[in-house]
Amino acid sequence: MNLKQLIYKRLVHAKDIGGLLAKYAGRPAVFDTEAPDDKQDGWEGKTQYPRLNIVLDMQANEERSSVGSLTITIYTERTSMVILEIESLVKTCFRDLLISPEDGGPYSFAWARTDPFSIEGTNVIGQDVTFDIMEYSAQETTDPDPIVALSRYIKKLYPDSIVLGVDPVGEFTEASVTPIFYSRLVTMDKASGHNMNIVAWMDCRMAVHLLCPDKAMNLKMLAAVMQKISVDEKISFWITHQ
């Protein structure tokens, strides 16, 4: 499935959200396009609200360090009192979550803002709940690879964690259940003064990210990685080719 399909799947299968939404064709009223009009049989003559619409924009925003944005639009009737509850549940649905589609990623989501609105001339109000999307793409570079070596080093230190690039991940991975490490290459430059005819030395700067909602645990685990590297003073590189 692609990213938009997985976002739709996540929302449709969220029972706490689905229980508050209208139904269309027997399923929670979640749409990744414009909602069908009120004359469609899928509504079965019942109310069209509350309902959700998905808007996915994969245009990168360098200022916010995001690869795109996700907007979940909530529509309810003005007399309904559930819009704030649905907003809270939608935010929770994507918190501390990694989604891994077939066409990229993995991706995580950070709530950016909520914009309320009303539709003039109707009894409908709504909220646009917008998330920034961050991508945790593969960072392998060469062989031997500094990112692969660092990722395996962290996996050995924390075998029960998920290390991207080492561990397989499913469509949905909850950082609240298992901490997720991600290593990326910041810079890689040829070192001066150490090169020989058959050897070229490279200076690499790498960053380690940890997705873990427990802030105290997050700090403790990252500090342990830094301390272990400082004590060992080296990370062994595995040669991956045969």
Residue ranges and their predicted role:
Residues M1-E63, T92, D96-A110, Y136-D189:
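Small/polar-rich, solvent-exposed N-terminal microdomains that initiate assembly or binding
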Residues L56, R113-V124, Q242:
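Glycine-rich beta-strand-turn "strand-cap" elements at beta-sheet edges
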Residues Q59-S65, E120-N123, G193-W201:
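Short, solvent-exposed beta-strand/turn "edge" segments of beta-rich domains on protein surfaces
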Residues S65-R78, V124-Y136, A200-A216:
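Oligomerization/assembly interface segments of phage tail-like spikes and tubes
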Residues S80-E85, T141, K215-A224:
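Short, conserved charged micro-motifs
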Residues I83-D103, M226-F237:
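Short, acidic/charged, Gly/Pro-enriched secondary-structure junctions
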Residues D103-D115, K228-V231, T240-Q242:
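Short beta-strand and beta-hairpin "edge-sheet" elements
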Residues N195-Q242:
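Intrinsically disordered, low-complexity segments enriched in Gly and acidic/Ser/Thr residues
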